[in-house]
Amino acid sequence: MKPLRLSSLDPVRMPEWRWAPFLSHAINALIPLKPEPYPVAPEFLQREGKTGSKSQPIKVTTCTWACRTKKFRQVRAACVEAGSSASVLNFVINPYHTFDLPFFGADLVTLPSGHLLALDLQPAITSDERHTKQVWERLMPIFEQWRVRLPEGGPIPEEAKPYFSPGFLWTRLHLGSEGNQLIDEVIMPAFRDYLNLYLDLVEMAEEVSPQRAFKLLEGQKRYLSYRGKKDPARAMLARFHGHQWTESYIHNVLFDL
């Protein structure tokens, strides 16, 4: 049977996937940067599965959209649609370590218990003011603008704090019309603002010295190693697609540095 997607740049088509407008906006914003396909093995470009009961199975589709550019080692979107069980967009921009840039991260998740939504420009080296100062000075006004309109998502685990900025926008919303309205009126414009700021920082970024690049690379490796070990989607993906596929996906695609 012919694969549904042949390239990491092929469109993600999943009917009723609620996060499609977010991915579409991000892809359009990247067009001026002339994205090229990022190497993703065929078994991770699109995978079908089932969840639910034998009498009432629910179709699961997991897709990966990915690219690279002059300054981005990897841009990737992990996209999951499983009907009432889950709808997910995990969108991360990994810059080359030769540029003094944070990661861009958006985690948009709908589960039967509600929406879990997070946006951030995540530092590679939290304790390094040279790395964080210019980012946080511009990020915090955007964060303050949108956080007052959202309920707080809850505390961040102590071990995770080094991997987030003070502008980590994190909320939990109830399912239903009120949550949908907040997604449309707050989360979507906040997503655009965070991404616009990030792309402005990218445009200004210049290559750093080899010594600085090595330090940034070490920070990126720590971040991606932590994310790979603590990925909260691991249990869900394993339930949908099996343990072996999930571990390979996490370590060879999502956090592959």
Curated annotation (Swiss-Prot):
Substrates-to-products reaction catalysed: (3Z)-phycoerythrobilin + oxidized 2[4Fe-4S]-[ferredoxin] = 15,16-dihydrobiliverdin + reduced 2[4Fe-4S]-[ferredoxin] + 2 H(+)
Family indicated by similarity: Belongs to the HY2 family.
Its job: Catalyzes the two-electron reduction of the C2 and C3(1) diene system of 15,16-dihydrobiliverdin.
PANTHER family: PHYTOCHROMOBILIN:FERREDOXIN OXIDOREDUCTASE, CHLOROPLASTIC
GO biological process terms, semicolon-separated: phytochromobilin biosynthetic process
Protein name: Phycoerythrobilin:ferredoxin oxidoreductase
Annotated Pfam families: Fe_bilin_red
EC number, as in UniProt: 1.3.7.3
InterPro entries with a match to the protein in the record: Ferredoxin-dep_bilin_Rdtase, Phycoerythrobilin_Fdx_Rdtase
GO molecular function terms listed in the Swiss-Prot or TrEMBL record: cobalt ion binding; phycoerythrobilin:ferredoxin oxidoreductase activity
Organism annotation: Prochlorococcus marinus (strain MIT 9303)
Keyword entries, A-Z: Oxidoreductase
